[in-house]
Structures are given as structure tokens and as C-alpha cells.
Amino acid sequence: MGGSDEKRMNFPLKVVDACCKIREKCNRPDFIIGYRLSPEEPFEPGITMTETIKLIKELVKKPIQFIHISQKNYFQETRRGEGKGTPRLQVIHEITKGKVALIEVGGLRTQSDFIKAINSGFSEFIAAGVSNMINKDLGTLLKENKGDKLEIELDPEHPEKYEMGRNVEFLHF
């Protein structure tokens, strides 16, 4: 399954196919299946947007409900390969739009970050990782336009503030 881009795509596509077959076998059309990936690696050799685009073009042909993109910065531009200099999500959304929902997580901390992401139109859904962990009422604060109350940095000196308990010491952002 290694070597060419096409051969390397065999494994993830077979996993998706297997999940879809199990959903069908169990007669569970309501069971949501998606695929999560990080679109580009900073080192060489590493995954480029050219390879990611090929995989996404195949994934949108599958009976999945979403593709979830994980990166450090929602607006990160493509480093190398196809789409260089263009926001990765813009490149990806041009492929997924109208075929499968795109979910993105990546460095959104402030209310203005979330608003900018929503207004970009680069994805159908926005996920919150760190922001959600350090603001247990994130959704309510954003909905009620109380972005000034958002914590944007983790306070390892006060783990009791978070519902992660002692595990907070293992988080590095």
C-alpha cells in the first residue's frame, strides 16, 4: 500500500469503505461517518496539499457525512504543493462544497476569531478544541456575545478551573 500517492490512499479509503459496509450491514443509515486529517506536514518528506487534495477528491465520492480538518491555524495558507499561498481550507472547501460537510478546528480562541472563521465560508462547521477545554461555557458565551469573558490561555496553576482535573498539566499549547 506504499509508494505512489494512489497506493498510499488505499489504506484510508479501505478503512472508510469498511466502516460504510458495517453501517449498511447493521442497517444504521443514521450512523454518521467522517474522516479526520491534518492536511499538510511542515517537513520534507511529508504530506503536501497536492496529496491531501487527491485524497479528499476520493473521500467526497464515499457515503460519508463529513471531513474534519485539524490544523493549528484556521486560516493557515498552503506551504507547498497545489494551492500554495492560498488558505488550505479554501482549497479544500472548493472540493467538498455541496458534497460533504467540512468541519475545521484550528486555533480559534477569541470571539472575533470565531466570527472571522464563520464569515470566511471556508467550512460548514467549526470545531473548538482548546477554547472549549478552557471555557466550559464557550457556546453560551459566544451566543450571548460575551467574548470579553473568554479565557484564551490555559492557566496550569489553577487546574480546578477546568473539568480536566490534574490532566491539565499534560496539555501544551
For each feature predicted by the language model, list its residue ranges.
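Flavin-dependent oxidoreductase catalytic cores
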Residues: 1-173
